[in-house]
Structures are given as structure tokens and as C-alpha cells.
Amino acid sequence: MLNASPLQTLDPQVFSAISEELARQQSHIELIASENFTYPAVMEAQGSVLTNKYAEGYPAKRWYGGCEFVDKVEVLAIERAKKLFGAEHANVQPHSGAQANTAVYAAVLQPGDKVLGMNLSHGGHLTHGNPANFSGKLYQFCQYGVREDNGLIDYDELAATADREKPKMITVGASAYSRIIDFARMGEIARGVGAYLFADIAHIAGLVAAGAHPSPVPHADFVSTTTHKTLRGPRGGLVLCKAAHAKALDSAVFPGTQGGPLMHIIAAKAVCFGECLKPEFKAYSEQIVKNSKALAAAFLSRGYKIVSGGTDNHLFLVDLRTKYPELTAKKAQETLDLANITCNKNTVPFETRSPFQASGIRLGTPAVTTRGFREAHMADIADCIDSVLAAIGTEREAVVVAATKKRVTTLTSRFPLPYQL
């Protein structure tokens, strides 16, 4: 027999932990650039009976029977994704962004092939060739980065590296780069050396979909993204590609790197894409950028250094060394968390510290924008952060942290989250 008791009764320990996390999310200012608050309808789809169904294969080409209704859901997700991004082909089955990237590599590369990707410490991602990651172990990566004087991608140097190394693929995309990426130029560079162009837009996908950032789709052979972050969907992955690569990509996802798809998550992706196609999503994405620019300006006015000097998207990287040379990002992150401000330590380009200590904090505005924060609130947030950082290591630290926490909870109480247990 199946125990149909509610979670609170069936497993009070798990229920308690979830309740505590809900309270944390409600009372904290969330500035981690990769986090957001999803739609209740997305959560409803994730918790649906579709979690019970195995559906290896693709719509109308399954290895199991009884897939006629999950087929409807996957077709909806595919068609909405294609429409949202103007893509020729979409695969909605990847379980995550890393799984999506794994499939792209597997579709057209062989182990040992050369790939040109962005250095992690300059704003790239683990799956773009970091030696600790599968990508760096399976493929021969050479890397490009940003200029030390201005924090911007040097496209001329990148082109020279591509011409010298002759990679089979060039990967473009970042997890901590705050400026517009010139996908058209990247396409020219890739075509010039006969390489595939693979754009990982996990961080900026929502901005791209809404027209708040140029799209890589016309220029890239493959485009991957997560479906959370700026898209506000479930945690999952998505790959877009040219029709010519569709068969290779689909085979690389299943059976190449995955088995059964998560149909409840695919349903949630369909809901997310449907919401992103509405006019309100464009306004939301534009507000993310407005808030990010306002928050960056508030930090600059307080004497902080921002890598690249500002932002064009949803995030930016504060280099703490200019104002607080002895303060590590690890200490800053931990102390801000005590004041109910959540962010993450991050290496900065040409970092001199260990990544476990780091010199930068990465700040993003998707989550606070979802809650309803606007430009005027960004000065308040910057003031809270500045107060805490200035007090670290002084006799005032505990008092300032407590006062800031009270100020933050007062602010967040004005913007309640739409969730109930």
C-alpha cells in the first residue's frame, strides 16, 4: 500500500528543513546571480504524476508504452522553446546545464579534440575546460580570458589564439562576465578557423529571450542553457541547434549521455517557456538589467571597484581589494549571510588568492527583481552591504550585523514570496 500521508506527517524532519528554507528565502535578500524564484505553477508541474512515467526516447519514438500524454507535454516544451529563441531545433531533455553541455560536446567532438573556451577565473564555467571537470579531462582545451586593464574580452587576441590553435570548437559564455558578448564576432572567428561555435547562455538566457541581450542563435551551431536562473523555470537544461545538427544532438542526449527523461521537469519547462513568451516577461527582464546597473552604480559611488567597470546584464563582480585589501571574499560572504544578505565569493580575473578565499563577490539581480525590487531599492542594498563590510574585524561588527539584519528583514517583509507549505 502507498502511504498517502502529507509530508508533514510522513516525514516531519524533511518538512521541517523545507519550512526553514522557506523562511530563509523570505527573510534574506538573494543576490546570488544564478538563483531566482520560480512560478508556483512550475512547482505544481514538478510535483505532478508525470514523475511516475518512464519515457526513454523522443515523442512518438519511445521505448515504453503509455507515453501518449507525456508526448504532448514534451512537444509543447519543444515548440515553445523554439519559438522563444527563434531556433531551428530544441532538445528539452537535459537534466541540467552541465548535462546539456556534455551532450553538445558528445554530438560533434571526439575525446582529445581541441576546444577554445573561457578561463574559469576570468568568468567562464567549469564545463568550459576546467581541469577538474569532465570537459578538461576528455578534451584538449586552450583558453582565452579578459584584458587586465579593462576586464573585457579581447576579441582580437581571441581571434589570434583561434588562428594559432585551430580548435574544432569554440565555446562562448560565462558565469561571471558582466558585459554584452559579441556573438556575431564570435561566429566570424569560429567560421574563420572552421570551428563549431557553441554558446552557453545559462546565465543570460532570459535576457536573450526577452531581447535584453543579443542572441547567439543566428551565429552559433549550438546553444545551451539552464532553465532556471533568468528564465525562472525548473532546475534543468536545454539545447538549441541548427537543423543540420539535430540528429547528432538528439543521439548525444539519448542514448548517448542520458536514459529516461524527467517528464515532470519537462512539463515544468513547458510552463516556464509559456510564461516567457508573454509580454510581462520582457518587462521583467528589462527591469533585471535596470536594477543591476543601479546596484553597480551604487557600489561605484561608494568607492568599490567593479570588474569591467560596470554591467550590461544581470550581474557584476565586485573586487574587494581596492577598498578592503585584507578582506577575503569568503569572510565577506559569511558575514553578509549573518545579516541576511546572500551572495557568493568569486575569483576575479588575475586572482592572487585561492578560489576558496577569493577577492570578489558576485552580485546579481534576478531574484530581487522577481520579488518586486526596483532601482530605488538598489541603493538600500548597497548601503547594507557596505555597512557590513566596513564593520568586519572591528568592535562594531556584531552590532552592525544585527542592525543590518533587522533592516533587511523589514525590507523583505514588504515583498512576500508566493509560496506556502
Curated annotation (Swiss-Prot):
The protein's annotated pathway:
One-carbon metabolism; tetrahydrofolate interconversion; Amino-acid biosynthesis; glycine biosynthesis; glycine from L-serine: step 1/1
Entry's localization field = Cytoplasm
**GO annotations of cellular component type:** cytosol
Entry cofactors: pyridoxal 5'-phosphate
Reported EC number(s) for this entry are 2.1.2.1
Q: Where is this site: Plays an important role in substrate specificity?
A: 228
Name the SUPFAM superfamilies for this protein. Answer: PLP-dependent transferases
This protein's superkingdom?
Bacteria
Keyword list (alphabetical) reads: Amino-acid biosynthesis, Cytoplasm, One-carbon metabolism, Pyridoxal phosphate, Transferase
User: Where are the N6-(pyridoxal phosphate)lysine residues found in this chain?
Assistant: 229
Matching entries from HAMAP family are given as: SHMT
Concerning its family, UniProt says: Belongs to the SHMT family.
What protein is this chain from?
A: Serine hydroxymethyltransferase
Species this protein is from: Opitutus terrae (strain DSM 11246 / JCM 15787 / PB90-1)
What gene makes this protein? glyA
